[in-house]
Design a protein with these regions (language model features):
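Alpha-helical DNA-recognition elements
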Residues: 56
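Residues within the DNA-recognition helix of helix-turn-helix
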Residues: 53
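Short, Lys/Arg-rich nucleic-acid/phosphate-binding segment
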Residues: 67-76
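Pre-recognition alpha-helix immediately N-terminal to the DNA-recognition helix
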Residues: 23-25
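Short helix-coil-helix linker/hinge
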Residues: 16-21
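Interfacial catalytic loop of ABC nucleotide-binding domains
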Residues: 12
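C-terminal regulatory/oligomerization modules of transcriptional regulators
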Residues: 1-9, 28-47, 59-64, 81-120
């Protein structure tokens, strides 16, 4: 496996999620799988624009597409949860960094010597 793969996945996910319309699509697809037409109606977007956004989400691996047996032309989209794992891991690292920083700041702020309350 290419050692750059996790960073490439993370970059693709963040690039895909950088657009508010795509985040709204993800929010809707987290509720339930939907057809492209449903998404277009709910988001008030042209089919062409929706198709471009869905392509970005699919390329990032965040959304998957499936046909239905009744009509091969109809595509149903759903969230691919495993693709969010690199984002979740990165966010956990950032959260831990901030937790440590805040802990250090608290220790500094509560230090009696710094506050002039130190007795020899």
């Amino acid at each position: 496996m290419d050692p750059r793969a996790p960073n490439l996945q993370l970059n693709a996910a963040f690039a895909a999620l950088s657009d508010a319309s795509r985040r709204e699509m993800i929010r809707m697809l987290l509720q339930k799988p939907r057809r492209a037409g449903e998404l277009a109606e709910c988001i008030d977007m042209s089919p062409q624009a929706l198709s471009r956004h869905l392509r970005v989400l699919r390329k990032a691996g965040l959304v998957s597409e499936q046909g239905i047996e009744e009509d091969a032309r109809v595509r149903v989209y759903s969230v691919h949860p495993a693709a969010f794992q690199p984002v979740q891991q990165w966010m956990a690292q950032v959260e831990e960094l901030w937790r440590r920083q805040l802990h250090s700041f608290k220790a500094y702020a509560e230090n009696p010597r710094r506050l002039g309350r130190h007795r020899p």
